[in-house]
Design a protein with these regions (language model features):
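Conserved beta-loop-beta element that borders a ligand/cofactor-binding pocket
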Residues: 275, 308-331
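Mid/C-terminal beta-alpha module of Rossmann-like enzyme folds, strongest
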Residues: 166, 376-423, 457
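Hydrophobic ligand-binding cavity/cleft-lining segments
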Residues: 1-58
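A conserved pocket-lining segment of Rossmann-fold NAD(P)-dependent short-chain dehydrogenase/reductase
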Residues: 338-361, 365
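Glycine/proline-rich active-site loop of Rossmann-fold NAD(P)-dependent oxidoreductases
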Residues: 316-318, 329-338, 373-383
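Conserved Rossmann-fold NAD(P)-dependent oxidoreductase catalytic core, especially the SDR/UDP-sugar
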Residues: 243, 255-297
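NAD(P)H-binding glycine-rich loop region in Rossmannoid oxidoreductase-like domains
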Residues: 206-253
Length: 462
């Protein structure tokens, strides 16, 4: 190496990992070339985002990340070098948190439809000799990151292998599920058209459900539409006005979209229009698959109206599927993000008496199920998006505490939740829904994380 290279003046720390992949090396390399690859590989427990990129994986191309270092945000600029198309590339830090950093990605065939990915990270901690004391912690952190990346890469490649590329429109692309779904689809070779409420740019279509506005021209010839848009249920206390906004954001937007798709000269083959397991209401210990009747209460009424609003598309001959989403597990948002602070500080525990059933799903299985519905012609109507093994809230708390290595014995009293949240406490936190994914099982979906513990360990790097 040149004498100006920090790696030539100090012995770097080295972390390596090798994993078998279910596709040829060229296919694994191509996955990394596509938009969304880095977003898919950033661990969700890290506060990091892609700010800028140029030139793909070619020598000299660059990527800039924004990363959190305690209370400070840093720019991490990396340049690609030593690229051999189909076989390898290296990221080299130009500016960032380490004194030096290189990351070699190598892909080698291991059979007609198999390969191996080998990652080798070399780094020198910051702050000179004083920083060396942190080397064991940094090595463990890098190893966690590589394990997450390899598991995500392996499972994404398996999900996309043999699937023809589609043009897929997505609403709610900036939400918790949508922001994970879009890079997953793009790295699989699909073309994603985002439906946005601001002035549309390339690859975007304008719509504004509150005004009944939608530009249908950009949807002509689309293969599939995945409709996720809707006001956040946990965005505020459920006043009469708030409940009306929750209903309107779902029913009006869905009806506008369904009617617009029905009028197209070349409509999509499928509309995947979101729903939620709240449609089942508070059902105690009853095991609920898709054949179960809907329940009572605000969320059940909302779910029925939400699904019914897609009728114009169904009546026009478009295949319509309704993913009834469970509690989606990701540290980037939703219930898990709110629970992490109290659980990490040892103040977590069951909600109420903890006997209510929580039906959860990892963020990767949530987006995997949506993709499965898009490419599975036999799947229509409602399908539950929950892990195969629901558990009580008390067991959820114990599991999260075990994963974080913290006690989970401090209960949250039901009366305190009701005082703070009103009706939402009973409907969203204290209600019991023991839901299982019957349709996903019968149509061949394979869960990455069939248990809540597996899901939590993946998304938290534990």
């Amino acid at each position: 190496m040149p004498t100006g290279d920090p790696m030539s003046r100090a012995r770097p720390e080295v972390v390596e990992l090798e994993t078998a992949l279910p596709v040829p090396a060229a296919e694994a390399y191509a996955w990394h070339e596509r938009p969304g690859a880095l977003e898919r590989l950033l661990p969700p427990w890290e506060d990091a985002e892609v700010l800028e990129r140029t030139g793909g994986l070619a020598d000299g191309s660059q990527v800039t990340l924004g990363v959190a270092a305690g209370p400070v945000r840093l720019r991490w600029v990396a340049r690609h070098r030593d690229t051999v198309p189909g076989a390898q590339f290296t990221d080299e830090q130009l500016d960032g948190p380490f004194a030096a950093w290189t990351h070699l990605h190598r892909f080698e065939d291991a059979g007609p439809q198999a390969s191996r990915v080998r990652d080798r990270v070399e780094f020198i901690p910051p702050f000179g000799p004083a920083g060396r004391a942190a080397s064991p912690v940094l090595r463990r952190k890098v190893a966690r990151m590589l394990r997450y990346r390899h598991a995500t890469l392996r499972d994404d490649l398996a999900a996309h292998h043999g699937i023809a590329p589609l043009r897929i429109a997505v609403t709610g692309a900036s939400g918790l599920i949508g922001s994970a779904l879009v890079p997953f689809l793009e790295t699989g070779g699909h073309t994603v058209v985002r439906m946005v409420r601001s002035r549309p740019g390339p690859g975007e279509v304008y719509w504004d459900p509150s005004r009944g506005a939608l530009d249908p021209a950009g949807l002509e010839g689309i293969d599939a539409v995945i409709h996720l848009a809707g006001e956040n249920l946990a965005g505020g206390r459920w006043t009469a006005e708030r409940k009306r906004a929750l209903r309107d954001s779902r029913t009006k937007g869905t009806r506008l979209l369904a009617e617009s798709l029905a009028r197209l000269a070349r409509p999509p083959r499928v509309l995947i229009s979101a729903s939620a397991i709240g449609i089942y209401g508070d059902r105690g210990d009853t095991l609920l698959d898709e054949s179960a009747e809907s329940g009572t209460g605000f969320l059940a009424d909302l779910g029925r109206d939400w699904e019914a609003a897609a009728a114009p598309a169904r009546d026009a001959g478009i295949r319509v599927a309704h993913p009834r989403m469970g509690v989606v597990l990701s540290p980037r948002g939703g219930a898990l993000a709110r629970l992490l602070l109290p659980f990490r500080t040892g103040l977590g525990g069951p909600i109420g008496n903890g006997r209510q059933w929580w039906s959860c799903v990892s963020i990767d299985d949530a987006i995997g199920a949506l993709h499965h519905a898009a490419v599975t012609p036999a799947l229509s109507g409602p399908f539950n998006v929950t892990a195969p093994e629901p558990l009580t809230n008390r067991d959820f708390a114990r599991t999260l505490g075990r994963v974080l290595r913290r006690p989970a014995i401090v209960p949250v009293p039901a009366f305190a939740l009701r005082a703070a949240l009103g009706e939402m406490a009973d409907a969203a936190l204290l209600a019991s829904a023991r839901v299982v994914p019957g349709v996903l099982g019968t149509t061949g979906y394979r869960f990455r994380h069939p248990t809540v513990e597996a899901a939590l360990r993946h998304v938290l790097g534990r």
